[in-house]
Amino acid sequence: MQPYNQSVNEVLEETKSQFEGLSPKEVKNRQAKDGFNELKEKKKTSTWELFIDTLKDPMVIILLLVAFVQLFLGEFVESLVIFIVLMINSVVAVVQTKRAESSLDALRQMSAPSAKVLRNGEKTSIPARELVVGDIVSLEAGDFIPADGRLIDVQNLRVEEGMLTGESEPVEKFSDVIEGEVALGDRKNMVFSSSLVVYGRADFLVTAIAEQTEIGKIAQMLETAEAKQTPLQQKLEKFGKQLGWVILALCALIFAVQILRLFTTNQTADMQKAVLDSFMFAVAVAVAAIPEALSSVVTIVLSVGTNKMAKQHAIMRNLPAVETLGSTSVICTDKTGTLTQNKMTVVDSFLPTQGSKELTDLTQADQKLLLNAMVLCNDSSFSQEGQLLGDPTEVALIAYSDKIGYPYQDLREKSPRLAEFPFDSERKLMSTINDFEGQKTIFVKGGPDVLFNRCNQVFLDGKVQEFTPELKEKFQAQNEAFSQKALRVLAYAYKPVSDNKTELTLTDENDLILIGLSAMIDPPREAVYDSIAEAKKAGIKTIMITGDHKTTAQAIAKDIGLMNEGDMALTGQELDALTEDELRENLEKISVYARVSPENKIRIVRAWQNEHQVTAMTGDGVNDAPALKQANIGIAMGSGTDVAKDASSMILTDDNFVSIVSAVSIGRVVYDNIKKSISYLFSGNLGAIIAIVFALVVGWVNPFTALQLLFINLVNDSVPAIALGMEKAEPDVMEKAPRQLNEGIFANGLMRVILIRGSLIGIAAIISQYVGQKTSPEMGVAMAFTTLILARTLQTFAARSNSQNILKLGFTTNKYVLMAVTFCLALYSLTTLPFLREIFSIPAAFGWSQWIVAAGLAVIAVICMEILKSIKGVFEKH
């Protein structure tokens, strides 16, 4: 028998629970037996699969082929070194990926939804994942239902279950037994995980958690999409394949030229050795040209970016989002809780006899009535731990009562509640019956415009009087005055009723006596002002999209600097009235959208995307999911539903607009740093190729062995390239216009930088080889290798910025670069040790005089890079 066929007592018995809830010990036992209330994640890629993936890179495959050929030819040391280096590279990439995965998993837990649960007779708020079968959970309007369950106490509950049933209308719920087997949409005494409470209140008994819930049974619908490569990684992979073919062609050409030279110069005496040398020359070019560390460096820098963002309260759900975020040109943000503190505070009240003022004297009948209405017609409370429970607006009212010296619990104890009619979005009212000073009294609170029309009398000068048109006008004028200040206004009324009145109906909310108004505000977050200004400076348009009133939204928008002179504010209805052409014409001028629907949100996003703008959109509800999917960057609130989080690219753990702008800034820095790493790697490789090709053309010996180049590319270069990924933001990172998503890898002068730096490194290596081979060809190779490794290492300082020279930056402002350079110099010194000299082709005669020349040439090359950078800066300034 299903829970919906059973009475409440039968379900309690079956789940071994009781009306007071479970004990902590029983909860622990059930969690140990059944696990937590969360859907199982997809099977993660195993460590072994990650390791194999690192070997699928086209550049790694070429190196593996080289290693096997060398092994076949008897070059055991060099082939072994290639295998070891590739193994180390793969292990580092796997470790970093696993570390990023585990930190992301830990951070995701921060954004878990919560549930109000009854345990041992006490109501408390817990993470929804800690729910067990048998728990009793309280629901109210706006709540996300955290598990499946049988309703046991219902007060006008309506739930939106469209995600499960396809029905667009909210379902009215009850607690009676249902006979026979019925479809999911007809189980009206049940609630289901991931549904939304539209209005009303209820308590339910948890009957299913995690995979056993209805949503758990269709969990594949909510599974996160497969991990995708970032656009940059796709471009690099495509470029890598093209580079691979070019390198193979170049190697074949060099090998052919070498063999041809052997025959034309009659150097065929030791043909096998000559062919082997020619092959190794070609291999050296392949090794020199391939940036072996590039793939892992990009992944590591992106992962570092995700960790930095997480510290700024922004959890990135995939790597492509980090890159896309840096291109954001439009941010569509909610108002409540994102731009504001989501902490409503009562700042004013209005009584017809006293005007606008704070309540201070409850000996006056009108003040006493107003404060009691605020506290009694109110479902919020504080837990024993001081935690806020309930709607933020209602919490503000009881907090106000406590603040002015009248504890809300005392007022409620003096006037106990006898019946209630919960708030709903159709009536825009809430009513209760309380035993107030020995008289059954209905208290009503709601929107001023609605409540004014329900009143025919007003409490004035200590007695009930007619609510005349003049008095109504006075109230309406005060309501408008409050609204102009972006204050949220509630009106309060009451009506004495007979002692036999036990329940409320719609007709009871008429012929009321108006008491007064309260005004509250959700103040803007302090840091929002600077963040809006920073976004504007960065060429990012910030748009407020809210369900609040247009007047309130405009007032907040103007206050925080989001709305300027000439900007427009539209309601959802006004937006619906615009044609696509009219919307396109006015799009740039519209800064505020108020009272919007989910369909409106999608239309706004598409309108900006049609203008080729990269758009970020915030959201927290099930209805926001389509707009979050549509946006280039969907941003879910940490307090939002799992459906919204699933549709998003990023989760804000603090629901704060400031965190969005911080994440955009980090996204820009990450992309800049990846390009710095790319320029560093390709400049060094180009320098090596220039030296090799020059040696081939003029008939010198190959300036580098394949082992030397592998050592530089894989061991030496990867550490500085990663260190560049840790570089702080350039001063103007948030002063540039947003980057276009389709921007090429080498755009904005990056290719020019690579050509200049690569040429300087190559020329330095050529001169070094020329000086060295006056002693012997072996000395030329040793000096060229020394100059190349030192120039590429010291180039790290130049690569830190394309606009600022190292003297301005300072040598110690990036400790990671300093450590990387020190590490590389220490590594190089190892190659000069007696037992390693032979492996790295460094002759015994190589001493201080040769080292000083080689190192001096490397330093000169880097100084030239910095001089050219400064000259470029002067030209750009003028």
Swiss-Prot record:
Spans traversing the lipid bilayer: 50-72, 76-95, 243-263, 281-301, 681-701, 704-724, 753-773, 779-799, 816-836, 845-865
Pfam families linked to this entry: Cation_ATPase, Cation_ATPase_C, Cation_ATPase_N, E1-E2_ATPase, Hydrolase_3
SUPFAM superfamilies according to UniProt: Calcium ATPase, transduction domain A, Calcium ATPase, transmembrane domain M, HAD-like, Metal cation-transporting ATPase, ATP-binding domain N
Annotated SMART domains: Cation_ATPase_N (SM00831)
GO cellular component: plasma membrane
Enzyme class: translocase
Effect of substituting M59L: CPA-sensitive
InterPro entries the record matches: ATPase_P-typ_cation-transptr_C (IPR006068), ATPase_P-typ_cation-transptr_N (IPR004014), ATPase_P-typ_cyto_dom_N (IPR023299), ATPase_P-typ_P_site (IPR018303), ATPase_P-typ_TM_dom_sf (IPR023298), ATPase_P-typ_transduc_dom_A_sf (IPR008250), HAD-like_sf (IPR036412), HAD_sf (IPR023214)
Superkingdom of this protein's organism: Bacteria
Annotated Ca(2+) binding sites: V287, A288, I290, E292, N713, D717
Control of this protein's activity: Inhibited by very high concentrations of cyclopiazonic acid (CPA).
Known catalytic reactions: Ca(2+)(in) + ATP + H2O = Ca(2+)(out) + ADP + phosphate + H(+)
Entry keyword set: ATP-binding, Calcium, Calcium transport, Cell membrane, Ion transport, Membrane, Metal-binding, Nucleotide-binding, Phosphoprotein, Translocase, Transmembrane, Transmembrane helix, Transport
Membrane topology: Multi-pass membrane protein
Consequence recorded when altering T54Q: Increases sensitivity to CPA. CPA-sensitive
PROSITE patterns documented for this protein: ATPASE_E1_E2
Cell compartment(s), UniProt: Cell membrane
Active site (catalytic residues): D334 (4-aspartylphosphate intermediate)
UniProt family annotation: Belongs to the cation transport ATPase (P-type) (TC 3.A.3) family. Type IIA subfamily.
Task of the protein: Catalyzes the hydrolysis of ATP coupled with the transport of calcium.
Protein name: Calcium-transporting ATPase 1
Native source species: Lactococcus lactis subsp. lactis (strain IL1403)
